[in-house]
A protein has these predicted regions:
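Solvent-exposed, polar/charged alpha-helical surfaces in well-ordered, non-transmembrane soluble domains
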Residues: 66, 77-81, 85, 134, ...
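Extracellular/periplasmic solute-recognition and catalytic clefts
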Residues: 20-31, 56-57, 69-140, 164, ...
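Extracytoplasmic/peripheral linker and loop segments enriched in polar/acidic and small residues
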Residues: 117-123, 127, 151-155, 159, ...
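Ligand/substrate-recognition segments at binding pockets and active sites
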Residues: 24, 43, 61, 69-78, ...
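Short helix-loop capping/hinge motifs at secondary-structure junctions, enriched
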Residues: 36-37, 140-153
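Sec-exported extracytoplasmic/periplasmic mature domains
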Residues: 35, 84-88, 106, 141, ...
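Structural transition elements
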Residues: 17, 143-144, 176-223, 245-252
Length: 322
């Protein structure tokens, strides 16, 4: 640990590729593992007989390529432009490029624009088994801990942040407000219809709606921060948000987030840093509020719920729970 020899920097595995270049701030390179045991691409027609797998795709031996290069682009617009110029093989569609990339056909379905079709670009759409969240450092003296004061403060912030608006502005509507830690497509997912987050939502006229901002202000009062003033010392409540990135989209998000906190009279100070420094803050427990996410390693709710287990905490146990 003292020499920074960890699985993050020196991963060990038996997969089809070797990580031959590992510079997260610039690029990462995977090269074909000549010692790979050999597997074929799976098919729905594969069968198991006598505990042995019989594959249909006997000729589709993986890996299919010799090398994969992942480059870091710190801003979305340059990344998109390089994709259009052929420097990259695939790209997500950022909110700034959404109208340039897709349009609605007569049936209301999303399709690529004619310009991109002429370039031979294909559009792939799927519901990602991923979650993104704003988290609190539970070791922090203000937002963390099990006290009612901290709990009411966290709940008030949850009510103040308009995630529907976030999805509309920053994701062009491509997202679903989470009702639990489990995303769509995974067993146990709460769809916000029959099952929902009762801390932030309520049932009215057979519709599930977000609790209003007045209830957030009531929670602020119960936490001892009525009107954003700490009732113990008479000072304004100031909280800190840790962020990564340096592009215009990052600062647009941070400006929006400050306005969300301002709804309940909280002054939010945003601290932008690079991802390595951000990870250090998470590992050391020095950050206060942050945004992070998790992509499914395998389609099982355990892969998301295990993050909440206290023995998987980052600071005390070097786990994945931030």
């Amino acid at each position: 640990k003292n020499k920074n020899i960890t699985l993050n920097w020196y991963p060990i595995g038996t997969g089809p590729f070797k990580l031959t270049e590992n510079n997260p701030n610039l690029r990462m390179v995977l090269r074909k593992n000549s010692n790979f045991r050999g597997e074929v691409y799976p098919s729905l027609e594969d069968k198991i007989k006598n505990n042995k797998l019989y594959s249909k795709n006997t000729e589709k031996v993986i890996p299919f390529i010799d090398e994969a290069i992942f480059s870091l682009e710190k801003e979305q617009i340059p990344r998109w432009n390089k994709f259009l110029q052929g420097y990259y093989d695939n790209s997500g569609i950022a909110s700034d490029n959404y109208d340039q990339a897709v349009s609605l056909n007569s049936s209301g379905d999303i399709t690529l624009t004619d310009e991109l079709k002429e370039k031979g670009i294909h559009l792939s759409m799927a519901t990602a088994a991923s979650t993104y969240y704003i988290g609190f450092n539970m070791l922090d003296g203000i937002v963390g801990g099990k006290s009612n004061r901290a709990k009411y403060l966290r709940q008030a912030i949850t009510l103040a942040i308009d995630y529907e608006e976030y999805i509309s502005i920053f994701a062009n509507g491509r997202g679903i407000v989470a009702q639990s830690p489990i995303p769509p497509g995974i067993f146990g997912y709460q769809d916000g219809i029959k099952k929902y987050n009762k801390t932030a939502y309520e049932l009215k006229n057979k519709r599930i709606i977000k609790k209003n901002i007045e209830k957030a202000k009531i929670l602020m009062g119960k936490a001892g921060y009525a009107n954003g003033i700490d009732q113990e010392n008479g000072k304004p409540l100031i909280l800190y948000f840790e962020a990564t990135g340096s592009g215009a989209d990052t600062y647009s998000f941070l400006n929006w987030l400050r306005k969300q906190f301002k709804k309940i009279n909280i002054q939010l100070v945003t601290r932008v840093t690079d991802y390595n420094r951000f990870q250090e803050k998470m590992i050391n427990g020095t950050g206060q509020i942050f945004q992070w996410g998790w992509n499914a390693d395998y389609p099982d709710p355990e892969n998301f719920l295990f993050l909440l287990y206290s023995k998987n905490g980052k600071v005390r146990y070097s786990g994945e729970n931030a």
